[in-house]
């Protein structure tokens, strides 16, 4: 396996990207890395580490796409950027998966324009895996498509099921649809029609509507929604977790008794923090693209980068792209036909 890594993507690049990549190489020896970015800067950082040089290549990319750039224009104009160069490696079959903590818009636009969608896939979807009370859950879509049709949501269900089955080994992943009630007739025009499609779909274990308060229950393995709703849900969860942690720290410091109690519960708090830490999950796969794409969090540190590479490895070993392709062509096209 070969991974094309945008060395200059993210708030902590390139240092965190290089360090996290070296750490990932020490964990598994079945992949190699192609860094894209300023060649001299990358080699200067690599010189600080001991690593198997036969597993690392560098492709010079002097330009950077920033979050201030208009994504589609930047992808078309900045052909020497680290994102564009890395995506071409995947498109040309020289790398199996692309990993970046850079501009989300540029990754989405570049993946679609350069690597292209899997035949039959109408829209790719950003699909982070999140912790719940009972295990991991995929939320799809989380921002790639603000406006969706019912057919898009049906395809998201197929793509999410393929990932959770291939990567996490979940047999017949339970699929839920975010809605404002659990009853079949609930929702707007989009969710009502999507419900009908999901209920009738072959190869999907659809278990019904999911209210927002049940997202973290662990009763669903894949939760489907349009990108506008998914992005709002994801950011609400991130903000809620951060606020709860802040309130908890404030209460702990409010009295000696609370501080002593916190010390006695230190291991439990540490375990909870680990479960809720995005660095443990690495990044969100962009599903529906004809090659592996992992979008890491913009503020990724070396731990998050290392986890993202581990996620890329599982994505490729799980044969997710081919599974999605087979599902879309075999299960959906004959019945949707749109």
Please provide the spans of the model-predicted regions.
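Short beta-strand segments
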Residues: 6, 35-36, 59, 100-102, ...
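Solvent-exposed alpha-helices and their adjacent loops that cap or buttress functional pockets
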Residues: 6, 26-27, 50-51, 75, ...
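Glycine-rich phosphate/nucleotide-binding loop
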Residues: 112-125, 131-139, 219-223, 227-338
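N-terminal phosphate-binding or glycine-rich loops at protein starts, especially the Walker A/P-loop
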Residues: 1-43
């Amino acid at each position: 396996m070969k991974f094309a890594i945008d060395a200059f993507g993210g708030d902590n690049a390139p240092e965190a990207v290089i360090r996290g990549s070296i750490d990932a190489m020490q964990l598994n020896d079945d992949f190699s890395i192609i860094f894209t970015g300023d060649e001299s800067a990358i080699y200067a950082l690599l010189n600080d580490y001991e690593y198997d040089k036969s597993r690392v290549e560098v492709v010079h990319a002097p330009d950077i796409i920033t979050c201030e750039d208009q994504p589609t224009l930047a992808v078309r104009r900045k052909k020497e950027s680290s994102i564009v160069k890395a995506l071409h490696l995947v498109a040309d079959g020289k790398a199996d998966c692309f990993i970046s903590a850079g501009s989300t818009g540029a990754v989405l636009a570049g993946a679609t324009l350069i690597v292209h969608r899997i035949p039959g896939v109408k829209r790719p979807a950003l699909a982070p895996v999140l912790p719940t009370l009972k295990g991991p859950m995929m939320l799809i879509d989380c921002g790639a498509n603000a406006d969706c049709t019912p057919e898009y949501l049906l395809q998201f269900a197929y793509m999410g099921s393929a990932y959770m089955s291939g990567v996490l080994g979940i047999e017949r992943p339970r699929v839920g649809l975010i809605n404002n009630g659990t009853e079949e007739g609930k929702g707007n025009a989009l969710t009502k029609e999507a419900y009908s499609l999901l209920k009738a779909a072959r190869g999907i274990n659809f278990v019904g509507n999911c209210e927002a308060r049940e997202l973290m229950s662990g009763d669903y393995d894949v939760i489907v929604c349009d990108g506008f709703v998914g992005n709002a849900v994801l950011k609400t969860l991130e903000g809620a977790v951060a606020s709860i942690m802040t309130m908890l720290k404030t209460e702990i410091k409010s009295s000696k008794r609370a501080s002593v109690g916190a010390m006695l519960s230190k291991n439990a708090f540490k375990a909870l923090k680990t479960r809720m830490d995005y660095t443990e999950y690495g990044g969100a796969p962009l599903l529906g693209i004809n090659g592996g794409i992992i979008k890491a969090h913009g503020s990724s540190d070396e731990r998050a980068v290392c986890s993202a590479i581990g996620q890329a490895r599982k994505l490729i070993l799980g044969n997710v792209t081919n599974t999605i392709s087979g599902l879309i062509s075999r299960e959906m096209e004959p019945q949707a036909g749109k």
